[in-house]
Amino acid sequence: MKLIRKALRDLSLAQGVTGDEGSAALVAEKFLRPLVDETHMDALGNLYGIRRSKDPQAKTVLLDAHMDEVGMMVTGQEDGLLKFNTCVGGVDHRLLPNLAVKVLTDPVIEGVITCPLSLGQTKEEQGKPFELEDLMIDCGLSEEDAKKIPVGTRVCYGTEPWFVGNRFFGKSTDDRACFVALLYI
């Protein structure tokens, strides 16, 4: 059970926004390697583990899971904030305001998704969800430093995983928990 918990936690902490899953694959390989005869990663970041049978007549079986996660992509900078009106995967933008995020630069920069203040809004606008284009990422950067973050930089949730009893909560668990389950088949 300890190893399952560690695998879930480590994989949830790994960054792997769709199209750039290499970091998550490296973490996954750490758990896969002791269970198979060989591992390798292809140019697209896909991780393969091969376990050979001692029976030369054995059938080949494929077990697979994916390790990507939904996220956002930087589309510009304004007043030291990052624009991100592009979502990668099924992001529900209504849940984004005040969410902790990680901008996947080297080193990673932490931030929070901000929304416009309601002071200038009409009564009709107040209480309605913000449009994705209204949201920005605040990393506490100067305008000059924000401009150094290239358009196209991926952004993932900054949620820390946690356990409540035997229940696990964290980002990207829909994909990563499936991988952990495959380790025990």
What is the role of each PLM region?
Residues 1-185:
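N-terminal hydrophobic/helix-forming segments and targeting peptides
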